[in-house]
Structures are given as C-alpha cells and as structure tokens.
C-alpha cells in the first residue's frame, strides 16, 4: 500500500500546530508519506495555526494556482486604549476595501508597498480591549500588519495577539487533520485499512471546485498531452460561465484533470482558441509525460534567429551539430555572409569557419 501512496497526486489539509515552521511541516509529511514531492500552499508563521494545504505528487505544480485564492482567518487583536464596539465596527468598515500594505521587516518578500483587498472584516466578540475578529482577504495579505494599521487609524493603537487560518480557497478547516492523524492513517493503510487515509486525501480536481470547467472531447486529449492548447473543435461541453482572461479547468470525459489555463474567449461566444494552457497533466501515450507550459522559454533572444539564419545559409541547416543531410542546397558566398553580418550586427562565434 505504501507504494500506492507514493504514487498519489492530490492534496492533504494539515491543521498546523503552533511552533513549527511551514517548511518543517513539509519535511514531516514527506517522512510520513515516503515521497519527496511535497509542498505547502501559503506559508504560515510559526506561531500561527490552522489550514496548511499540502500538495502531493503532481499537485505541487498547482501550488501557484491555489495560492491565488482568498484566505480566511480568525484572529485576536488588542487595542492599547479603551474602544467601544461601534468604534471597532467603524474602523473595520474603513478597512473592508483595497488597502496599501508594507510587508513587515521579517518577511519572505521585498519591502515594497502593495495593494491588497480585504473582502470581509467582522468583529465576532469584544471584551475590554480584546477583539476577536474574522477576515477574508486577498492572498499575500499580512494580518499582523493589518492589525497594526487598524490600531493606528482608530487612534487607539493595537496589535495582533493570536491568529488561525480557517480556509485557503476551497480547502476548509473542517477537512483538516493533524500530523498525528496523518501518521495513524498511513500506518492503518500499510495494514490494508486505507479508508481513513483515502477519505482525507483530495484529488487534484478539488482545487477547481469553484472554477468553470470545460470537458474536452476524446479526440483532443492526445493533442493536449503533447502540449497543444484547446481549440473550439475539441470542446465537448462547458460547466459554468467564464470570460476572456479567467482561469478555467479542463477535464476529460472520464473526469480526469487534463490541465488548466487562461480562457481566450467568453463561454457565451467560443472562438478558435478557447484555452491557453499553462499547466498540462495528462500523459501522452508516446511522449515524455506531464507538460508544464512556460511561455517565456519560447521567447528568443534578440539576434538569435538572425544568427541561425546566417549560419544555415552559409553552412546548411545542420552545420551546428555536424549531423543530418549531406546535401544542403545552394550556399551563400563568404563575402555575402560578411555583408549580412555587418548589416545585422550578428557575427559568428570565435573559432568558426
């Protein structure tokens, strides 16, 4: 059974305890599952508890996708001076919008002012200067900084005391398990009792519960596996509405995750290219397997193609490798090559003949 666990691709939601870093949790999950392909989504500070989504296997390639989703927290902040409930609600209303944030000194990113959106900010309970609150915010929002800013704007001063993450996108607190639970479930699975483990292991499609979905025709699957984008002729059906620029999920007719990418048209008006993939997960029948599209790698450096054209014209298309066809066709005279080089500014490498 342990061999099957090591081949699984999906997510496990860990209820991170107070104390260890997120990277320490990564290490422990690797040790428990016996696999190296493990990564967390959304780093939590050592003193913060709650939802830490662990991506397993191929799902590590979806970390950047899930990380885009909003996060929810329940926290405790302390005001430095007496403040009424109405004053708390009023200052919370002021922050339920787009705000400017400067990351703290101890952060994993550069200290540049950023714009983040606070979708919800509510007071749950108040006792004296202590306020229990709930916040739903854009990914990358620093709650400790938010509490400090709230205290400053209120004129009372304030700081965060405690914090717990309760959701990352579709991954909620109620499906989280402790590291001890995970170890126990894996031990049971080794004995052939894998029901508990499988009930808490989430398929990769779980990350796209709230995304619009496109089902591709069987005839399009092999093309997608070889890196092709999805065109209108390969669309079988659409579940949900989307607009150009939205992220969409592409499934097979058997509900297998083929890939995800950016829509190039509206769902109400499909035209030519429908999805521009940035992640492809389906394996080709006769290929190298999974494909992760990186558009930047397809961009050529200035002069790169010009250099190739001159080289091919002078020495034949296979001159760089010395392999291939013996007959290269008509060649340009050396003086013509020099003129082309002077005109374009592209010259042969030293030592070339």
From Swiss-Prot:
InterPro entries referenced in this protein's UniProt entry, alphabetically: Dyskerin-like, PsdUridine_synth_cat_dom_sf, PsdUridine_synth_N, PUA, PUA-like_sf, PUA_sf, tRNA_PsdUridine_synth_B_fam, TruB_arch
Domain of life: Archaea
Active site: 45 (nucleophile)
GO molecular function, one term: tRNA pseudouridine(55) synthase activity
Swiss-Prot/TrEMBL keywords: Isomerase, tRNA processing
Enzyme class: isomerase
Biased composition (Basic and acidic residues): 309-328
Lipoprotein listed as a keyword: no
EC number: 5.4.99.25
Sequence segments annotated as region (Disordered): 292-353
Pfam families: PUA (PF01472), TruB_C_2 (PF16198), TruB_N (PF01509)
Alphabetical list of PROSITE patterns matching this protein: PUA
Listed SUPFAM superfamilies: Pseudouridine synthase, PUA domain-like
Membership in a protein family: Belongs to the pseudouridine synthase TruB family. Type 2 subfamily.
Protein's UniProt name: Probable tRNA pseudouridine synthase B
UniProt lineage: Archaea, Methanobacteriati, Thermoplasmatota, Thermoplasmata, Thermoplasmatales
Designated gene of the protein: truB
């Amino acid at each position: 059974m342990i061999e099957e666990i090591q081949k699984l691709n999906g997510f496990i939601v860990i209820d991170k305890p107070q104390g260890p870093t997120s990277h320490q949790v990564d290490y422990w999950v690797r040790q428990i599952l016996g696999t190296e392909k493990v990564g967390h989504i959304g780093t939590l500070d050592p003193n913060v508890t709650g939802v830490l989504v662990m991506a397993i296997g191929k799902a590590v390639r979806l970390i950047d996708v899930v990380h885009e989703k909003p996060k929810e927290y329940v926290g405790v902040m302390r005001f430095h001076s007496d403040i009424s409930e109405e004053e708390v609600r009023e200052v919370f209303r002021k922050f339920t919008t787009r705000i400017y944030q400067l990351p703290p000194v101890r952060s994993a990113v550069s200290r540049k002012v950023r714009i983040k959106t606070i979708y919800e900010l509510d007071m749950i309970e108040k006792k004296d200067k202590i306020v229990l609150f709930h916040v739903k915010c854009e990914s990358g929002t620093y709650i400790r900084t938010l509490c400090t800013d709230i205290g400053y704007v209120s004129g009372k001063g304030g700081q965060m005391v405690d914090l717990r993450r309760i959701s990352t996108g579709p991954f909620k607190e109620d499906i989280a398990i402790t590291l001890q639970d995970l170890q126990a479930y894996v031990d049971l699975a080794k004995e052939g009792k894998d029901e508990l483990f499988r009930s808490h292991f989430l398929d990769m499609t779980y990350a796209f519960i709230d995304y619009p979905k496109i089902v591709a025709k069987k005839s399009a699957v092999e093309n997608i596996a070889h890196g092709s984008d999805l065109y209108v002729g390969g669309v079988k059906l659409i579940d949900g509405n989307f607009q150009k620029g939205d992220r969409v999920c592409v499934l097979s007719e058997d509900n297998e995750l083929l890939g995800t990418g950016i829509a190039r048209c509206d769902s109400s008006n499909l035209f030519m290219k429908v999805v521009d993939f940035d992640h492809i997960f389906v394996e080709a029948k006769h290929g190298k397997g999974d494909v992760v599209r990186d558009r930047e790698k397809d961009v050529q450096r200035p002069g790169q193609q010009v250099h190739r054209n001159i080289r091919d014209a002078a020495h034949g298309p296979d001159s760089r490798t010395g392999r291939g066809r013996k007959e290269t066709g008509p060649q340009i005279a050396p003086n013509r090559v020099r003129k082309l080089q002077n005109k374009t500014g592209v010259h042969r490498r030293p030592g070339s003949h």
